[in-house]
Design a protein with these regions (language model features):
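Hydrophobic anchor residue at the start of the ABC signature
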Residues: 125-126
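Conserved ABC ATPase signature
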Residues: 111-115, 119
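Q-loop/switch helix immediately C-terminal to the Walker
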Residues: 69, 75-93
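Walker B catalytic motif
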Residues: 111, 141-142
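Conserved ABC ATPase "signature" region
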Residues: 91-107, 129
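ABC-family nucleotide-binding domains
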Residues: 140, 147
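Helix-to-loop junction immediately C-terminal to a conserved catalytic motif
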Residues: 47
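A short, flexible loop at the N-terminus of ABC-type nucleotide-binding domains that lies
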Residues: 1-21, 51
């Protein structure tokens, strides 16, 4: 399975953001570029949250996504948030994955509304990666807001859990891209 983008164009008013963008993603890959170059717009088009001016996107089948805004259920714990999409995921499995990304027992007991920004990012990333039904993954700046020492653990979890699914990880962080070791497409 592949995500195929063909001649995608998008402008905001008279400002072009994407011009005849073409790309085939059949494995985990990184989309890099400076802030404001259209990376998030591209993800929003892939997910059907925004329309392109022209061009086509095919193959975004049953996606799981991490957005720049964390979209956790605030009243649930981080583990309960993971279990929402991780059908068959046990509470013990969810807590084990969260502990691997630095969660303590006390933090595991908190509702998502009381977690720090970095904790929410880690939980949102794991929720997407553990989504058993997802055939594609779209991850928008998933390591933003994480402490530097946790980024390596988050990268390792991303590589392990994404597997070979077509995955697009958007970042402007060259260090994270290098740690992933995935092919990079510059925008």
């Amino acid at each position: 399975m592949s995500i195929v983008i063909t001649d995608l164009c998008k402008s905001f008013g008279s400002t072009p953001v994407l011009q005849r963008f073409t790309w085939t993603v059949d494995r985990p890959m990184v989309l890099m570029g400076r802030s404001g170059c259209g990376k998030t717009t591209l993800l929003r088009i892939w997910l059907g949250l925004e329309s392109a001016d022209s061009g086509t996107v095919t193959g975004v089948e049953t996606p799981a996504a991490v957005f720049q805004e964390d979209r956790l259920c605030p009243q649930l714990t981080a583990a309960a948030n993971l279990m929402l999409t991780g059908h068959g995921l046990t509470p013990q499995d969810a807590e084990r994955e969260l502990r691997a990304l630095g969660f303590t027992d006390a933090e595991l007991a908190l509702p998502a509304a009381r977690l720090s920004g970095g904790q929410k990012r880690r939980a949102a990333l794991l929720r997407a990666l553990l989504c058993r039904d997802a055939k594609t993954l779209l991850l928008d700046e998933p390591f933003t807001g994480m402490d530097a020492e946790l980024v390596e653990d988050a990268v390792a979890a991303t590589k392990r859990l994404a597997g070979e699914r077509p995955t697009i990880l958007v970042t402007h962080d060259r260090t994270a891209a290098d740690l992933l070791g995935w092919p990079v497409r510059e925008v």
